Amino acid sequence: KKFRAKQIYEWMHIHHVTSFDEMTNLSKNLRETLKEKADLIVLEEELVQISKIDGTRKYLFALADGNMIESVLMKYKHGNSVCVSSQVGCRMGCRFCASTLDGLERNLTPSEMLRQVYQIQKITGERVSNIVIMGTGEPLDNYDNFLKFIHMVSDEHGLNISQRNIT
């Protein structure tokens, strides 16, 4: 049903819930069905480092499979930017980058990329206005998932971040 789909979408992309139980305008039966048939991506905050120079925050998040990814929040006068990881590890072999040391473990899903932004917004209580895809991994090596992430994060019914504010 279109109405139910809209409700679920809003819970996920506006309220950033991490459990179907939080979707209180859905019937208990529907929430139970959703729990049986779907998973919500949850990132566990393992560590946060805060720069004494400018307040930049680097988050280490654990994925459901135990892999770790990093995301960075940078605060500016014009708004908040989040640096998002696109892969666990990297296969590019750039000598200057530590992400490549253990090679590529796997690509992140669009939902795992999106959840980094949602998680930081939930932690800080502040809106993210810009996204930088310069975390762990090479986004063009995860092209299809990267494009899906861009469409989701720029959707007018969700975060509605302009594609011009995504680099």
What are these regions (language model features)?
Residues 67-88, 92-167:
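Conserved Radical SAM active-site core
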